[in-house]
Amino acid sequence: MEEGLEASNLPPEAWPSEVTVSVTGEPPNTSVEEKEETAKEAVIETSPEIMKPLSILDVLRISAVLEDTTDQLSILNYIMPVQYEKRQSISMKDNKEMHLEGRSSEKVPLASNPSKISSPLVHKEEPKLPEIRQGGQFNKVQDLIFKKPTRQTIMNTETLKKIQIDRQFLSDVITETLEELQEEGTFTNLLKALGKERESKMHFYDTIAREENGRKKIKSLQKQLLNVKKERQAEVQNRNEYIAHLKDQLQEMKAKTNMENRYMKRNTELQISQTQKKCSKTEELLLEEIEKLRLKTEEENRIHAEIELFLRKEQQKLEEKLEFWMEKFDKDTEMKQNELNALKSAKASDLAHLQELAKTIREYEQVIIEDRIEKEKTRKKREQDDLEMRSIIKLQAWWRGTVVRREIGGFKMPKDKDDSKDVKGKGKEKDKRRGKK
């Protein structure tokens, strides 16, 4: 196809069609990085802008190359093994080829003389594929192709399916491009197919990269899981040893507690007998104490009655004092409230007076600021006047000097004799110089 395109003298816009053929046929064994590099090198940016239709000669050349390609793809389809072919895709391909053959003979009126255009398209006929199948030749070809065991190992089912899908896709794209070239003289369908295929390949590469990252993560997680399992096993072993140690301690504690229980039982029996003796003695003592307490309570009741009478009298006195102090509190609070009201009124009057004073102070400050501004203006004006006067005096002095030096008007400087001699000498020197020149 490259030789056909170079021989057809196509413009540069038509060259991306060859890129699709080279990109779609990558082997499946290449790594992801190599695929990405080849895809980046092979991708040529094609914008779906409005393309100018090609010339009739270019259309005919490209159509011839594309028809040759479709014929080769259809032959490849028939060479494929029967058990891996898709019958439906073959029938659809045959229908498209028949339709293309009919349209190629009809849609020739792209130029003024249809006889010259239709002549190169008519002799390009579909290869006679049914004749190849006659006499069992197709089965013989298959037997020859797949006779060796190496071919059987390489051409597995998945590879054949992928080849068949790629072949069908390429055939469809070329067919649509051929129809568009014959109808409109452009190949936008080819550019669109290029863009879609490029996007699908980039998505495929991204999927492969994500899968590799996932595998790496799974490997790292498996390593972590093994490490965790080892740690857990070591921890379980340590805990089992600790449990055995605790069981030994438990047996020792049980034996120790049994001995302590026997000792405590005997000890408690002795203590009970001793406490019973003590209790009998203490009971006698408590009875004596109860009698004493009874006498004491009678005396306390009598004292309590006397204290209660005394407290009632004191309570009455305190209530009278409380009434007195409550009345005094009311009077004092009323007096203090009056004083507070008087202080508030005085505060309000003082506040009003302070506000008036603040207002007066602000007015005085404004007057002072205005006076300072006025003084500053007069000072600047005085300085300006002085500056102007000095400038005028300097200007007058300069003018007087200029008038005197240049003898303007009636002003002339007195000339001495020596000066006249010098002037004459200078005149003679000037005349000598002029003569030399």
Curated annotation (Swiss-Prot):
One of its GO terms (biological process) is sperm axoneme assembly. Keywords: Calmodulin-binding, Cell projection, Cilium, Cytoplasm, Cytoskeleton, Differentiation, Flagellum, Spermatogenesis. Pfam families: IQ (PF00612). Transmembrane segments: none annotated. Component of the nexin-dynein regulatory complex (N-DRC). Interacts (via IQ domain) with CALM when calcium levels are low. Does not interact with CALM in the presence of Ca(2+). Interacts with the HSP70 proteins HSPA1L and HSPA8. May form a complex with CAMK4 and HSP70. Its main location: cytoplasm. The IQ domain mediates interaction with calmodulin when cellular Ca(2+) levels are low. It is found in: Cytoplasm; Cell projection, Cilium, Flagellum; Cell projection, Cilium; Cytoplasm, Cytoskeleton. GO terms for molecular function: calmodulin binding. It comes from the Eukaryota. The keyword Lipoprotein does not apply. Residues 388-417 form the IQ domain. GO terms for cellular component: cytoplasm; manchette; motile cilium; sperm flagellum. Belongs to the DRC9 family. InterPro entries: IQ_motif_EF-hand-BS (IPR000048), IQCG (IPR042618). This is Dynein regulatory complex protein 9. The keyword Cytoplasm applies.
